[in-house]
């Protein structure tokens, strides 16, 4: 890559921005903590979607200023990417998180992708705004699928419980280091009744599962060749 001068924000964040995803399916990647495998999972899902012929736009909604994650999304095939620093925010909070998410969802959807994938940096419990975002009824209403990244089966159990009981969200899949071995996968599937795939060893299975949950399994790989 060739570096370019850093600039925070190409436009100001509107805290009253409306949300309109124009019917585009949305996949959210949440985690039990930082470094739980969210970016790896998002990248694997994006790569599989591109392989299947889908046009994918992606963004990172929360965390601290670091473009590495969205560069990974681009390397995996995302057409357009954004991060909260594009809106002048260098560290997200409970106040800015929902507005940032609405703004980036709306902007991504305006390009009419087949699907939007976004990562919620930090864990479900933290100070960067993830909890605030997942409490917003309008944002929850547009989430077609939520994938949970967890470091171990105990974290997976707690994360699934939080999503279900605190936020009223049913995760479609668990990934992350908790799925690094067959024992972890079996525990998640049997004790939590949630599908589990590893983003590193089974990226195609992870991506295909999410695509099926979105109802986009009919898209033909030949679409890529036609672009």
Cite the ranges covered by each PLM segment.
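Conserved catalytic-core segment of NTP-binding enzymes
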Residues: 1-9, 66, 93-115, 120-206
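Short, flexible helix-coil linker/hinge segments at the edges of structured domains or between repeats
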Residues: 1-22, 74
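Walker A (P-loop) phosphate-binding motif
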Residues: 12-64
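Gly-rich Lys/Arg/Thr-decorated short loops/hinges at beta-loop-alpha junctions or inter-strand turns
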Residues: 24-28, 81-89, 140-142
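A short secondary-structure junction signal
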Residues: 39-43, 69-70, 128-130
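N-terminal phosphate/diphosphate-binding loop that engages ATP/GTP or pyrophosphate donors
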Residues: 47-92, 161-163, 175, 183-191
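NTP-binding/hydrolysis catalytic cores, primarily Walker-type P-loop NTPases
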Residues: 197-227
């Amino acid at each position: 890559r060739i570096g370019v001068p850093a600039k925070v924000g190409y436009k100001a964040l509107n805290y009253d921005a409306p949300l309109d995803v124009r019917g585009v399916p949305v996949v959210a990647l949440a985690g039990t903590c930082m470094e739980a495998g969210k970016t790896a999972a998002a990248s694997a899902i994006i790569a599989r979607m591109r392989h299947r012929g889908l046009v994918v736009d992606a963004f990172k909604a929360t965390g601290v200023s670091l473009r590495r994650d969205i560069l990974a999304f681009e390397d995996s095939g995302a057409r357009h990417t954004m991060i909260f620093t594009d809106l002048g925010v260098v560290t997200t909070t409970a106040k800015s998180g929902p507005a940032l998410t609405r703004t980036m969802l709306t902007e991504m959807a305006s390009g009419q992708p087949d699907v939007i994938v976004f990562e919620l940096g930090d864990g479900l419990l933290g100070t960067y705004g993830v909890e605030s975002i997942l409490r917003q009824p309008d944002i929850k209403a547009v989430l077609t699928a939520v994938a949970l990244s967890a470091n171990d089966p105990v974290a997976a159990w707690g994360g699934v419980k939080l999503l279900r009981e605190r936020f009223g969200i049913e995760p479609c899949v668990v990934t992350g280091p908790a799925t690094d071995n067959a024992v972890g996968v079996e525990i998640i599937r049997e004790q939590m009744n949630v599908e589990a795939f590893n983003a590193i060893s089974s990226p195609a299975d992870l991506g295909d599962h999410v695509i099926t949950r979105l109802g986009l399994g009919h898209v033909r790989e030949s679409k890529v060749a036609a672009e």
